[in-house]
């Protein structure tokens, strides 16, 4: 078991984990694709960076400021409501594991009247100059996700609904500017003390599969024993475990292979690795393209 100082250091590293992204402008009217290089936080959201990206690209096409944009990876629209690190692990990690691509991530920025609303949440708000307000849409979605996780953890959404206007604003600003100290000060008002959790909000993704396991997890069994990460995987992904109790794939959280902690209490894994919406996102790569 790590000391409190070690846990603080790990959480700080997870909070500040980053990804190098290369964004190409998807405009058929431009012969040579323009690119924008940026380092983004894993525990953040793409719309936070859209204003900077748009400011750079609008010198090539002014329309981009007034049309909602989306990102694509290998022609597939990216769901911006998920944390960037989760998207990276879900869509790109398998290519790295197979040594087919390097760790940087190349995406294409698209904009048109034909927004892929069947795959991506649309941006519906605008500013007074008719430019797209990405911040307002993102805030609405993230706060809703925090309400969902709060309900799972507490059995109701009262802790987040009862936040003062000042605390609500500070919580959002801490996410927007990526301030861990401010975030923790408000988030602790949402999460019950002394680990008195009703359930734990957990989502499990399998790259290449449309299946999403959205599993509110009881941290303790009926007999009072702590539920392990292994127990969760065996229950929801029985094909992951072999007959001799070995894993047939790799388990990633925040881009880290966590097989060494598979026998840890799920409540401790959640507490350490939860994302800023208080969900624990687990990515499972089956052995067809995973290495341990």
From Swiss-Prot:
Subcellular location field: Preautophagosomal structure membrane
Alphabetized Pfam families for the sequence: ATG5_HBR, ATG5_UblA, ATG5_UblB
MF term (GO), any: Atg8-family ligase activity
GO cellular component terms given for this protein: Atg12-Atg5-Atg16 complex; autophagosome; mitochondria-associated endoplasmic reticulum membrane contact site; phagophore; phagophore assembly site membrane
InterPro entries membership: Atg5, ATG5_HBR, Atg5_HR, ATG5_UblA, Atg5_UblA_dom_sf, ATG5_UblB
Gene Ontology annotations of biological process type: autophagy of mitochondrion; cellular response to nitrogen starvation; piecemeal microautophagy of the nucleus; protein transport
Membrane topology, from the record: Peripheral membrane protein
Entry keywords, A to Z: Autophagy, Isopeptide bond, Membrane, Protein transport, Transport, Ubl conjugation
Highest taxon listed in the record's lineage: Eukaryota
Crosslink (Glycyl lysine isopeptide (Lys-Gly) (interchain with G-Cter in ATG12)) position: 147
Post-translational modification: Conjugated to ATG12; which is essential for autophagy.
Described function: Involved in cytoplasm to vacuole transport (Cvt) and autophagic vesicle formation. Autophagy is essential for maintenance of amino acid levels and protein synthesis under nitrogen starvation. Required for selective autophagic degradation of the nucleus (nucleophagy). Also required for mitophagy, which eliminates defective or superfluous mitochondria in order to fulfill cellular energy requirements and prevent excess ROS production.
Subunit-level organization: Conjugated with ATG12.
Homology family: Belongs to the ATG5 family.
Protein known as: Autophagy protein 5
């Amino acid at each position: 078991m790590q000391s409190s100082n070690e846990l603080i250091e790990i959480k700080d590293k997870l909070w500040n984990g980053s990804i190098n992204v290369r964004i190409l402008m998807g405009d058929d009217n431009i012969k040579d694709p323009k690119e924008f290089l940026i380092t983004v936080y894993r525990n953040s959201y793409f719309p936070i960076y859209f204003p900077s990206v748009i400011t750079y690209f609008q010198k090539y096409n002014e329309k981009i400021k007034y049309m909602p944009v989306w990102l694509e990876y290998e022609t597939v629209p990216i769901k911006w409501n998920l944390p960037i690190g989760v998207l990276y692990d879900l869509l790109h990690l398998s290519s790295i594991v197979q040594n087919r691509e390097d760790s940087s991530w190349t995406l294409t920025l698209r904009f048109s009247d034909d927004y892929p609303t069947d795959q991506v949440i649309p941006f519906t708000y605008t500013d007074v100059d008719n430019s797209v307000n990405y911040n307002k849409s993102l805030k609405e979605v993230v706060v809703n996700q925090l309400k969902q996780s709060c309900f799972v953890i507490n059995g109701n959404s009262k802790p987040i609904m009862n936040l003062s206007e000042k605390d609500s604003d500070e919580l959002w600003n801490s996410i927007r500017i990526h301030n861990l100290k401010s975030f923790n000060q408000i988030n602790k008002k949402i999460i019950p003390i002394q680990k008195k959790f009703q359930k734990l909000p957990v989502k499990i993704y399998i790259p290449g599969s449309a299946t999403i396991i959205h599993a509110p997890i009881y941290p303790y069994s009926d007999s009072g024993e702590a539920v392990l990460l292994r127990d969760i995987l065996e229950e929801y992904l029985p094909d992951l475990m072999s007959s001799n109790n070995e894993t047939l794939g790799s388990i990633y959280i925040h881009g880290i292979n966590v097989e060494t902690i598979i026998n840890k209490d799920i409540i401790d894994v959640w507490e350490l690795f939860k994302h800023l919406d208080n969900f624990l996102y687990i990515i499972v790569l089956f052995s067809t393209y995973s290495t341990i």
